[in-house]
């Protein structure tokens, strides 16, 4: 799926068929078939699921800071899901690209934009939760919708910059033997470019966030449980589930990216990794549809989900109540909620 042009004397990867010989019949590999099935499911679940989350959170964004965070997460996931039909057409037709050079640069790159946007937004949410615990008075005075939207805007801009190599190095490639057009990532003849991109992607998009967010939520969970702040604990648990799913579904993609960048196309490791790459990319796409499922499961028990509409369940999870009347003391309730005069958490 993620095609990279290959030169005879460097280590850039290629997803062109393994040679064109007489009587060779092209067909989808088992890995491609699995990838197609996964992507179809992701599209069918992710588009309506994320569209519903966008609708619910957009209605609540003026009153609840949490709604702003989850609105941007859902928008990033929805954007990636909407590109899937075109990518599916290319995959089913053995990576033949029908849609021109501009679409080649933009559409396959959306998954990387999603990766960086998601992890940066999750880091922003984590910082927000941490500030609510460590500096509740500061949050009471300065935490508001304008600051939240500014933080989300910065996350999107930084994600665009981090994913820009994919936009810059993607192009269409005409295969002379098969007379097909492929959408490829061409790093040229300098292997260091591909390795640098893969390394930055691994460090910025995975390892550093994994370490920092693990430490952050270990502290937050211990703090909320010790104070029995049930409402805040529920929000933290939802975010922990979203963060965990991100790392689970992106891990295979990161591993294959490093292996393909550091091994010769002639090596057995490279060939075996390449055979799994389409599945790993599709597996990463699952992260684009899993969040709405997490929100619904976290909303209520099974009976509650039967009795209440999906928008009500999502609204309950993605926004937080204002001040609990049973905890009027600000010192005892800053983890749970903020006072009535401030925006809801």
UniProtKB/Swiss-Prot annotation:
Modified residues (Phosphoserine): 309, 312, 322, 329, 333
Extracellular side: 1-32, 89-105, 170-195, 261-277
The keyword Iron-sulfur is annotated on this UniProt entry: no
One GO BP: inflammatory response
Tissue expression: Expressed strongly in macrophages and spleen. Weak expression detected in lung, liver, brain, heart and kidney.
Residues in compartment: Cytoplasmic: 60-64, 128-148, 222-237, 299-345
Record's GO cellular component terms: apical part of cell; basolateral plasma membrane; cytoplasmic vesicle
Molecular function GO terms recorded: complement component C5a receptor activity; G protein-coupled receptor activity
Transmembrane intervals: 33-59, 65-88, 106-127, 149-169, 196-221, 238-260, 278-298
One Pfam assignment: 7tm_1
Keywords associated with the record: Cell membrane, Chemotaxis, Cytoplasmic vesicle, Disulfide bond, G-protein coupled receptor, Glycoprotein, Membrane, Phosphoprotein, Receptor, Sulfation, Transducer, Transmembrane, Transmembrane helix
Keyword check for Glycoprotein: yes
Membrane topology: Multi-pass membrane protein
Predominant cellular place of this UniProt entry's protein: membrane
Coiled coil residues, start to end: none
Subcellular location: Cell membrane; Cytoplasmic vesicle
Location of Sulfotyrosine modifications: 9, 11
Sugar-bearing residue positions: 12
InterPro entries on file: Anphylx_rcpt_C3a/C5a1-2 (IPR002234), Formyl_rcpt-rel (IPR000826), GPCR_Rhodpsn (IPR000276), GPCR_Rhodpsn_7TM (IPR017452)
UniProt PTM: Sulfation plays a critical role in the association of C5aR with C5a, but no significant role in the ability of the receptor to transduce a signal and mobilize calcium in response to a small peptide agonist. Phosphorylated on serine residues in response to C5a binding, resulting in internalization of the receptor and short-term desensitization to C5a.
Origin superkingdom: Eukaryota
Bridged cysteine pairs (disulfide): 104-183
Protein purpose: Receptor for the chemotactic and inflammatory peptide anaphylatoxin C5a. The ligand interacts with at least two sites on the receptor: a high-affinity site on the extracellular N-terminus, and a second site in the transmembrane region which activates downstream signaling events. Receptor activation stimulates chemotaxis, granule enzyme release, intracellular calcium release and superoxide anion production.
Subunit annotation: Homodimer. May also form higher-order oligomers. Interacts (when phosphorylated) with ARRB1 and ARRB2; the interaction is associated with internalization of C5aR.
Protein name: C5a anaphylatoxin chemotactic receptor 1
Organism: Cavia porcellus
């Amino acid at each position: 799926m993620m095609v990279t042009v290959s030169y005879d004397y460097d280590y850039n990867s290629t997803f062109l068929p393994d040679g064109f010989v007489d009587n060779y019949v092209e067909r989808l590999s088992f890995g491609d078939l699995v990838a197609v099935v996964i992507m179809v499911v992701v599209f069918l679940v992710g588009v309506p699921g994320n569209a519903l989350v966008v609708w619910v959170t957009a209605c609540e964004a003026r009153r609840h800071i949490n709604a702003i965070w989850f609105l941007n997460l859902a928008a990033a996931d929805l954007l990636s899901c909407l590109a899937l039909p075109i990518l599916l057409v290319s995959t089913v037709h053995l990576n033949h690209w029908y849609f021109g050079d501009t679409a080649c640069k933009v559409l396959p790159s959306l998954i990387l934009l999603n990766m960086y946007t998601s992890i940066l937004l999750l880091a922003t949410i984590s910082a927000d939760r941490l500030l609510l615990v460590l500096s509740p008075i500061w949050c009471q005075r300065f935490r508001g919708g304008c600051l939240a939207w500014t933080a989300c805007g910065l996350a999107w801009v930084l994600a665009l910059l981090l994913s820009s190599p994919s936009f810059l190095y993607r192009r269409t490639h005409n295969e002379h033997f098969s007379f097909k057009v492929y959408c490829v990532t061409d790093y040229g003849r300098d292997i260091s470019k591909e390795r640098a991109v893969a390394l930055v992607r691994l460090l910025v998009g995975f390892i550093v966030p994994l370490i920092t967010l693990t430490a952050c939520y270990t502290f937050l969970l211990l703090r909320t449980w010790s104070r029995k702040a049930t409402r805040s604990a529920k929000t933290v648990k939802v975010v922990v589930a979203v963060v965990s799913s991100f790392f689970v579904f992106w891990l295979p993609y990161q591993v294959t990216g490093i292996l393909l960048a550091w091994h010769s196309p002639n090596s057995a490791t490279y060939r075996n990794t390449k055979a799994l790459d389409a599945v790993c990319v599709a597996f990463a796409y699952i992260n684009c549809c899993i969040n709405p499922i997490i929100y619904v499961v976290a909303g209520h028990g099974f009976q509650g989900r039967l009795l209440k509409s999906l928008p009500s369940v999502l609204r309950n999870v993605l926004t937080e109540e204002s001040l609990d009347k049973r905890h009027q003391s600000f010192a005892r309730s800053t983890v749970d909620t903020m006072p009535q005069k401030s925006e809801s958490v």
